[in-house]
Curated annotation (Swiss-Prot):
NCBIfam families, per database record: Obg_CgtA, PRK12297.1, PRK12299.1
Cofactor(s) named in the record: Mg(2+)
Subunit structure: Monomer.
Species annotation: Marinomonas sp. (strain MWYL1)
A Pfam family the protein falls into: GTP1_OBG
Keyword Cell inner membrane attached: no
Stated role: An essential GTPase which binds GTP, GDP and possibly (p)ppGpp with moderate affinity, with high nucleotide exchange rates and a fairly low GTP hydrolysis rate. Plays a role in control of the cell cycle, stress response, ribosome biogenesis and in those bacteria that undergo differentiation, in morphogenesis control.
Source species taxonomy: Bacteria, Pseudomonadati, Pseudomonadota, Gammaproteobacteria, Oceanospirillales
InterPro entries associated with the record: G_OBG, GTP-bd, GTP-bd_Obg/CgtA, GTP1-OBG_CS, GTP1_OBG_dom, GTP1_OBG_dom_sf, OBG_GTPase, P-loop_NTPase
Protein's UniProt name: GTPase Obg
Amino acid sequence: MKFVDEASIYVRAGKGGNGALSFWREKFVAKGGPDGGDGGNGGSVVLVADEALNTLIDFRFTKKYIAESGEGGQGRDMTGSKGADLEIKVPVGTTVIDEDTGETLGDLVRDGQKLKVAQGGHHGLGNTRFKSSTNRAPRQTTKGTVGEERTLKLEMKVLADVGLLGLPNAGKSTFIRAVSSAKPKVADYPFTTLVPNLGVVKVKKHQSFVIADIPGIIEGASEGAGLGIRFLKHLVRNRILLHIVDLAPWDEITPAEAAVIAVNELHQFSPALAERERWLVLNKTDMVPEDELEERCQSVIDALGWEGKAYRISAISGEGTEVLCLDLMTALDEKRELLLESPEAREKEKAVRALIDEEGRNRIMSLREKRRKAGLLLDDDDFDEDDYDVEVEYVS
């Protein structure tokens, strides 16, 4: 199944049923009163988060969703049937945007969470409603109103506590294999990771966190090079970013240069995302001669102007990964407690995520517009083989 994290759909709620014009007719009742019933309300369109889904690919093929209209009223004060609501299942982690106004309608972040995106039309009134002491035989009715319609943009972002950032072949996939049961593809060539991979890291009994590996970014990614920029948005919901630096790169670039490139591209994509809490992880210590290790690590720290702790690990052997995961669990627990106890912290987190969303979306749309003008992108979308047949799933 292809991994698709964006889609546009058209939704229209059902029309309300018209009110009925009717009078009671019965043997020996010459002038029965009005008995026209109301129409039924139109069905609404509702999105429902489903944790069993992990891609928006279905919306690439079915783009129109129309809810059922309400039925018209009938005589004998019979109300028309209400149109059934149309429920559309989307993956957990889907952001819903009104494509015409740019307004974010909501985030579906919990399994079973619902979001009404188009309100059904209101029912029309039958002539019974207009009976009065001065008008015993009203012929007035009203029609049902039309339902709301919208063009929606759906954006799916994977839900993870920790996100991995780095250049291709930095060892991100090897790291996620080492600390969880996830088994992303690993090989000695760039862009082995083509879509996000998720793994559940179990630190202690009943203590775990989710980690996300996205395709590596390269120099010029913010201008459209490589695969990484379209996946950087998946880091929006991460509480901590792990910047993994390869101490033994296979090409001519130095570890210090690689570290600076990743940070610069992150800033270009979203300054707010670049300000997220970020930890430095120096990987492949086992592949560096012992007499060169200290100097190589220090070169990265100096190039970044890094003042915090720098973790030294070997993802392939597991050296240093246990301490790193324990520290991550402690930090994440502290962040969860703060969000639970402080409304101000929750509001701040919400505002930061919204800002990252806006900055990232604007950047991606700007690049797509440039590609369209250059004739590199079709008018409908960019659905191509870059998506690949890989599923994103939580593996514990």
